[in-house]
Amino acid sequence: MSNQFDQLKKLSTIVCDSGDPELVKASGSQDATTNPSLILKVAQEPKFQELLNEAVVWGIRQNGDDLQTLSFILDKIQVNFALEIIKNIPGRISLEIDARLSFNVEAMVQRAVFLSQLFEAMGGDKKRLLVKIPGTWEGIRAVEFLEAKGIACNVTLIFNLVQAIAAAKAKATLISPFVGRIYDWWIAAYGDEGYSIDADPGVASVSNIYAYYKKFGIPTQIMAASFRTKEQVLALAGCDLLTISPKLLDELKKSQHPVKKELDPAEAKKLDVQPIELTESFFRFLMNEDAMATEKLAEGIRIFAGDTQILETAITEFIKQIAAEGA
């Protein structure tokens, strides 16, 4: 029998969640995702120093002010790594805009357009790029505009059905519901209850979103993310896409146990589910009613923003070093 990774590839598109081009290559996945946290882990490794150096020099040459220069460099670093990664996969790469813009529609649109244009200018195929936008109300409005302009979006930091419905209404190409972070919240809030995989809150959330989308023929793709265990991954076999860390991908490759399709669009269409209409006020009310989604969305934005700031600090020091060497 083939290993679980190969079996799973027949049921879902496999996406490697890493900023390391070499790990993505070794993964054998179709697509890849990255974010500031993942880029931060690899950007300063000696083997990738040239990708960082080139981005810094390029950013300085754009002749912006200090803040603009940092923004240019951050986006160029992402694009540099993305172009290396897509050499090793047949599919798409997801890149993320600055999380500090999560509540500014105009700024998110401008940054996403710039990132897309830069990716193309450096030789990337626009059809292979997804721009990750946070699942705030403002982020989803930015997605609505960007999708209409032909820029494919991945709505990230999805923690409940409300966000998923809003993203679908905005015609998002794809959403990323975070299985593991939902699970983390429930464990922190109520203690380790020893959830069986059938009762896993993160798995249940993605299953509900999947059922709603397939019931109503919504074309937005679902890419389950943020897995803590191999069991969570397997419990969502059949989901459109699964973005998985290199560690869990290795675990799947080492197991020969059979993989069962857990999510089926035909079964979803049989469910007695009513459509939900969302206005801005209703969206905000329902998010406020969901403590988990509210807290994890805020936390996710803070984490990504914090990692971006750390990366900016490293870049600033590197710029000073270049200036000192040129003096």
UniProtKB/Swiss-Prot annotation:
Entry-linked Gene3D superfamilies: Aldolase class I
Keywords (A to Z) from UniProt: Cytoplasm, Pentose shunt, Schiff base, Transferase
An annotated GO BP: pentose-phosphate shunt
Annotated localization: Cytoplasm
GO CC entries: cytoplasm
Catalytic reactions of this protein: D-sedoheptulose 7-phosphate + D-glyceraldehyde 3-phosphate = D-erythrose 4-phosphate + beta-D-fructose 6-phosphate
Active site positions: K132
EC number of the protein: 2.2.1.2
GO molecular function, one term: transaldolase activity
A Pfam family reported for this protein in Swiss-Prot or TrEMBL: TAL_FSA
InterPro entries given in the database record: Aldolase_TIM (IPR013785), TAL/FSA (IPR001585), Transaldolase_1 (IPR004730), Transaldolase_AS (IPR018225)
Pathway participation: Carbohydrate degradation; pentose phosphate pathway; D-glyceraldehyde 3-phosphate and beta-D-fructose 6-phosphate from D-ribose 5-phosphate and D-xylulose 5-phosphate (non-oxidative stage): step 2/3
Entries under HAMAP family matching the protein: Transaldolase_1
Main function: Transaldolase is important for the balance of metabolites in the pentose-phosphate pathway.
Family: Belongs to the transaldolase family. Type 1 subfamily.
UniProt name for this protein: Transaldolase
